[in-house]
């Protein structure tokens, strides 16, 4: 069974619960993906830094309780754990980052594990914002490819955290160029390709990288994949959303769980089935508040697919 390493930020999400209260929820896209993968029965390890503080210990204990490997999760005594206030309006979300730079931005090469052949590394763009995390992330990508593994990238753009839009595009596109698997939202893809329509953005990215598995998520409508000149829309199941915070991360968890356990994932019938399950994982995650708490188990996913 191939292991999935997830590199990046582990975040404490503060989610409104009534007028004067916030729920403290474990979050951060990479941490969510690691937990999501583990709940689906696949081996997962987290690579990243949190503060040596109550919130950092809370994150480490949370991941450990979910059977995610935390040997590469460093408690940094000099930095603070990333904390985000999540705003919800009709189920859609907004983010206010309370700690910048946070501990995750201080990841060092010495924090990286020894990668093995056929393992997967997944990351998001927050890991690329500042040094030393940026250089460490690119070194992790180099090492996993050298070991005979795969790199998956979900930009998950947070423009407000970057010094400039130009720097964000330049650095994120460097990671895009190195990925075997890419997951974009429509807005992210048009921004990164300097286009204004999904059609133009898709044409640009597939012409540049025909050999990569490129997936564009379309919310309740499912996802479109492109690979080696082939493309297909894989429809999703619509559910009434309570909170969309973890939907993208749940999709990625389902996707990685499927890809990592299949040696012939580039075959159309296999890929369609993997993406169908990823769509279902994303849909299920919208039915509860909080990103991590809503991630489905393997049993929940199988039951939903059977309905």
Model-flagged regions — what are they?
Residues 1-69:
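Glycine-rich phosphate/adenosyl-contacting loop at the front of the ribokinase-like
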Residues 147, 161-233:
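Conserved phosphate/ATP/ADP-binding segment of small-molecule kinases
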Residues 100, 126, 156-160, 187, ...:
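Active-site beta-loop-alpha junctions enriched in small/polar residues
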Residues 35, 83-87, 222-226:
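Short beta-strand scaffold segments in enzyme catalytic cores
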Residues 1-3, 142, 198-307:
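Conserved phosphate-binding/catalytic region of the ribokinase-like
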Residues 10, 126, 155, 250:
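Active-site metal-binding loops of divalent metal-dependent hydrolases
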Residues 43-123, 303-307:
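Conserved N-terminal subdomain of the carbohydrate kinase-like
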Residues 37, 185, 248:
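Short, conserved phosphate/pyrophosphate- and ester-handling motifs at nucleotide-, phospho-/glycolipid
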């Amino acid at each position: 069974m191939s292991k999935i390493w997830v590199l990046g930020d582990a975040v404490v999400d503060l989610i409104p619960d009534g007028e004067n209260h916030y729920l403290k929820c474990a979050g951060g896209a990479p941490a969510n993906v690691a937990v999501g993968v583990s709940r689906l029965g696949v081996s997962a390890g987290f690579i990243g830094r949190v503060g040596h503080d109550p919130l950092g210990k809370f994150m480490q204990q949370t991941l450990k309780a979910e059977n995610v490997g935390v040997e590469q999760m460093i408690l940094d005594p000099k930095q603070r754990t990333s904390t985000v206030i999540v705003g919800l309006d009709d189920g859609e979300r907004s983010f206010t980052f309370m700690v910048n730079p946070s501990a995750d931005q201080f990841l060092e090469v010495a924090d990286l594990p020894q990668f093995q052949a056929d393992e997967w590394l997944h990351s998001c763009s927050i890991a690329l914002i500042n040094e030393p995390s940026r250089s460490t992330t690119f070194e992790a990508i180099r090492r996993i490819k050298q070991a005979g593994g795969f790199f998956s990238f979900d930009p998950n753009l947070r423009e407000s955290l970057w010094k400039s839009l130009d720097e964000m595009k330049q650095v994120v596109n460097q990671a895009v160029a190195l990925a075997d698997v890419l997951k974009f939202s429509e807005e992210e893809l048009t921004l990164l390709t300097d286009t204004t329509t999904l059609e133009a953005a898709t044409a640009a990215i597939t012409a540049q990288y025909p050999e990569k598995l490129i997936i564009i998520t379309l919310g309740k409508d499912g996802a479109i994949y492109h690979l080696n000149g082939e493309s297909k829309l894989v429809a999703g199941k619509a559910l009434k959303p309570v909170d969309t915070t973890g939907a993208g991360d749940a999709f990625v968890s389902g996707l990685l769980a499927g890809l990592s356990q299949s040696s012939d994932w580039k075959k159309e019938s296999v890929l369609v089935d993997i993406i169908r399950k990823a769509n279902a994982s994303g849909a299920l995650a919208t039915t509860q508040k909080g990103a991590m708490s809503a991630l489905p188990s393997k049993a929940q996913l199988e039951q939903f697919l059977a309905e």
